[in-house]
């Protein structure tokens, strides 16, 4: 943004030498003249209030007055517009009147005294008006805030509030009394007008603050220069505004990559944690391109609106919604930056701490920060849109408790859905098991989640039930679907043959192209820069779903067999492919068993008879 401001300043300085030649083309506005017009309208309004027949016209004059006040407010900061008060002449007149008052203060001529007193007060409030505008112009710049305008306005409103009203004795003549009353009426009307305008400026500081340097450079001069170049004779001002707006839009969009790169470079210098990792620097830069580019696009549209409405301010509703979008974009940018640099910073702190530092605390800190960013952004948007945030928070008390009791189950399911979304326990399309429910997640709503069971039945499960029970998510696996089997061999197998069989099975699995091994880990297969630091907080293999364990051991002397445990993981997690890999492994194991002349055991029993009774056979008997 500063780069754009400097560009506009350079353009202004480049065109400034020609300004003196064409200065006469645009007449400066007399602000004091606008004040007098507002004062006259107030006088008409006060007169019509006393006449019921003219009361219907008051709204028309109020509209005209409000338009003048808005126009005046937008011109207060423009130094090309004259204040219209000769302050030197004003001070000289004050000195003259003060001298006359000092001589007549003990005199009996009350009429002359009050006339001079009212004249002096009128000069004093004119001086206050001049000092106010001069203070605004000398103190407010492109980097000023609303509170600066409010503070200046409060100080001068306090000075205007110190002026008193007067009462006149009844022994004055009718002519003198009428003249004093007329002077007092003019004085009171002017005092009220000045107070009204200053209060408006205090309550609408945005209309005074310069926007995008429009007030700092001469917009009239720039637009006139553009209209001179364009070959249009009619509507040249409107066309000039469009051309200037489109130029700024193209400039901002063209500079987005440069601004993003400068922002990333600045953050690198601040945190000093990315100096040895250029790849992470590039990835973080990519992550902030979208929010920065959208921000610049919105900013350019905001500038274009200011140009279109110049010299008046943009409509309040437009400014309100644009401000809300700014807050959302800022939250988006902060989250993107924190994901890139914040996680790395916190992780770096954890790795430098003692071994007693709990890694769970880091995870909690990260989640709390994300939640706080979301809450702050939400409250900021609500406040920008005009909601009373304090009242909203207070309404969550007794009234919120009554509503919560009435719709307890609905709220329980709603907040359970929020918890499930924040926890990211599952996504649509995942295969999950929760209690007696098993199937594929079809859709997660605010109240219930629909699941398609494997028998093709559609199940509707309340979110509170899912949030309150353990969830087994079979789809959160990247590499590794378990293959576990017991290979039973006969007891007639020799020890050496069993050892060679176990060794060959293990070598076969280690060399199998579809069985996971040590090379199939998360850090060697995932290129996302965020996990480079996250590995010091949690196990990346378990976090992303990588399993590569492989065990082959003689495991058990069973009733009818000597069992060999085979425990490994296929690289694929797809069921059909997993079945193919498992089949291939089983066939290869059969070949190894046959190679070592071993036999698969099967459940059997051997009966041993220790003795039989003697049986004598008669002669001629057949057995």
UniProtKB/Swiss-Prot annotation:
One of its GO terms (cellular component) is plasma membrane. It holds the Pfam family MS_channel_3rd. Disulfide bonds: none annotated. The lineage of its organism: Bacteria, Pseudomonadati, Campylobacterota, Epsilonproteobacteria, Campylobacterales. SUPFAM superfamilies: Mechanosensitive channel protein MscS (YggB), C-terminal domain, Mechanosensitive channel protein MscS (YggB), transmembrane region, Sm-like ribonucleoproteins. The chain crosses the membrane at residues 242-262, 288-308, 318-338, 361-381, 387-407. Keywords: Cell membrane, Membrane, Transmembrane, Transmembrane helix. It is a multi-pass membrane protein. One of its GO terms (biological process) is transmembrane transport. This is Uncharacterized MscS family protein HP_0415. It comes from the Bacteria. Belongs to the MscS (TC 1.A.23) family. It is found in: Cell membrane.
């Amino acid at each position: 943004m500063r780069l754009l401001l400097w560009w506009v300043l350079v353009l202004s300085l480049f065109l400034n030498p020609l300004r003196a030649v064409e200065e006469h083309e645009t007449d400066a506005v007399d602000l004091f003249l606008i004040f007098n017009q507002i004062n006259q309208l107030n006088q008409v309004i006060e007169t019509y209030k006393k006449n019921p027949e003219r009361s219907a016209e008051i709204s028309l004059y109020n509209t005209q007055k409000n338009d003048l006040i808005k126009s005046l407010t937008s011109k207060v900061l423009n130094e090309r517009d004259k204040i219209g008060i000769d302050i030197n002449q004003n001070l000289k007149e004050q000195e003259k009147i003060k001298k006359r008052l000092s001589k007549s203060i003990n005199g009996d001529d009350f009429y002359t005294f009050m006339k001079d007193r009212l004249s002096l007060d009128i000069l004093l409030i004119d001086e206050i008006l001049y000092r106010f505008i001069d203070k605004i112009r000398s103190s407010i710049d492109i980097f000023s805030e609303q509170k600066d305008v409010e503070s200046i306005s409060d100080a001068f409103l306090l000075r205007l509030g110190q002026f008193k009203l007067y009462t006149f004795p009844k022994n004055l003549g009718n002519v003198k009394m009428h003249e004093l009353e007329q002077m007092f009426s003019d004085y009171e009307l002017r005092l009220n007008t000045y107070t009204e305008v200053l209060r408006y400026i205090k309550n609408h500081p945005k209309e005074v603050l310069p926007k995008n340097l429009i007030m700092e450079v001469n917009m009239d001069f720039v637009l006139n220069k553009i209209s001179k170049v364009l070959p249009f004779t009619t509507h040249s001002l409107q066309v000039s505004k469009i051309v200037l707006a489109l130029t700024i839009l193209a400039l901002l969009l063209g500079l987005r990559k440069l601004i993003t790169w400068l922002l990333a470079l600045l953050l690198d210098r601040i945190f000093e944690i990315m100096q040895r990792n250029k790849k992470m620097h590039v990835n973080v830069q990519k992550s902030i391109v979208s929010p920065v580019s959208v921000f610049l696009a919105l900013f350019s549209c905001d500038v274009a609106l200011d140009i279109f409405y110049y010299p008046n301010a943009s409509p309040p509703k437009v400014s309100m919604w644009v401000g809300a979008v700014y807050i959302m974009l800022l939250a988006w940018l902060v989250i993107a930056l924190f994901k890139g640099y914040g996680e790395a910073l916190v992780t770096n702190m954890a790795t430098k701490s003692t071994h007693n530092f709990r890694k769970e605390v880091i995870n909690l800190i990260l989640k709390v920060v994300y939640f706080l960013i979301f809450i702050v952004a939400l409250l900021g948007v609500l406040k920008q849109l005009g909601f009373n945030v304090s009242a909203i928070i207070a309404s969550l008390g007794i009234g919120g408790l009554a509503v919560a009791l009435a719709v307890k189950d609905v709220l329980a399911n709603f907040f359970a859905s929020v918890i499930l979304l924040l926890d990211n326990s599952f996504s649509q399309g995942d295969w999950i098991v929760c209690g007696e429910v098993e199937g594929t997640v079809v859709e997660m709503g605010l109240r219930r989640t629909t699941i398609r069971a494997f028998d093709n039945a559609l199940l509707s499960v309340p979110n509170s039930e899912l949030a309150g029970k353990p969830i087994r998510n079979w789809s959160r696996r990247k590499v590794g679907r378990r293959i576990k089997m017991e290979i039973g061999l006969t007891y007639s197998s020799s020890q050496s043959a069993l050892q060679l069989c176990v060794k060959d099975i293990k070598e076969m699995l280690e060399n199998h192209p579809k069985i996971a091994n040590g090379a199939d880990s998360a850090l060697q297969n995932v290129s996302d820069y965020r996990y480079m630091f996250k590995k010091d907080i949690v196990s990346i293999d378990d976090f992303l779903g990588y399993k590569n364990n492989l065990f082959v051991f003689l495991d058990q002397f069973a009733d009818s067999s000597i069992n060999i445990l085979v425990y490994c993981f296929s690289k694929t997690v797809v069921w059909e492919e997993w079945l193919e890999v498992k089949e291939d492994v089983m066939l290869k194991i059969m070949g190894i068993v046959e190679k070592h002349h071993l036999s698969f055991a099967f459940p059997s029993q051997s009966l041993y008879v220790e003795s039989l009774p003697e049986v004598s056979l008669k002669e001629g008997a057949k057995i």
